[in-house]
Amino acid sequence: MQKAMTLREQLLKSEGCSYNAEISADFGDKVYSFTLSCSGKKDGDVIFSVVRPESISGISGVLSADGGKITFDEDRALAFPMLAEGELTPISGSWILYETLRSGYITSCGTDGDGVRVTLNDTYEDEALQVDVWLNGEDLPEKAEIFWEGRLVLSMMIMNFQIL
């Protein structure tokens, strides 16, 4: 538990963080995969840019508790269905990760191999998104999974996580 609390404290005291996330969104009949470059800010916003696949690279935006804004060229667009009964979009998973690390309800924490696995809820309400985060040997996120009503809906491999 201490490692999760230390990470939270570092994020709250810092100017934010940066990381890349390989995201897979599972809609049951189809899985969408893409890679984002993300920057979490002190105010809680996440600025992102799509890195892969090339067909949607360059799409960027800002995500916050109030919603999001996406910018794209005329020849590119994002069209993902909603996940978790409208609670989550594949792109907003990067904001959910950052927000739950900073303020989510920690429901459990324990060792998992050489690292630590932390389970958090995004709210204190009954229908919360569950976010499982694996911390590496440096106590930084390396993987996250988001569940809705016990079903895995979004997974992220996190690379180059740095606290700013």
Annotate the PLM regions.
Residues K69-T100:
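Acidic/charged, solvent-exposed loop-and-adjacent secondary-structure segments enriched in E/D, K/R, S/T
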Residues F27-V31, V51-S57, E125, R151-V153:
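Solvent-exposed loop/turn segments connecting transmembrane beta-strands
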Residues V50-R52, I70-D75, E145-E149:
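Beta-turn initiation residues at beta-strand->coil junctions
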Residues L36-G40, G61-L63, V133-L135, N160-F161:
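Extended lipid/amphipathic-ligand handling interfaces
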Residues T107-L164:
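Gly/Pro-enriched, hydrophobic low-complexity segments
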Residues S57-L63, F80-A84, L129, L152-M157:
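A short, polar/proline- and glycine-enriched secondary-structure boundary/capping micro-motif
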Residues M1-L36, G40:
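N-terminal leader/targeting segments and the immediate start of mature chains
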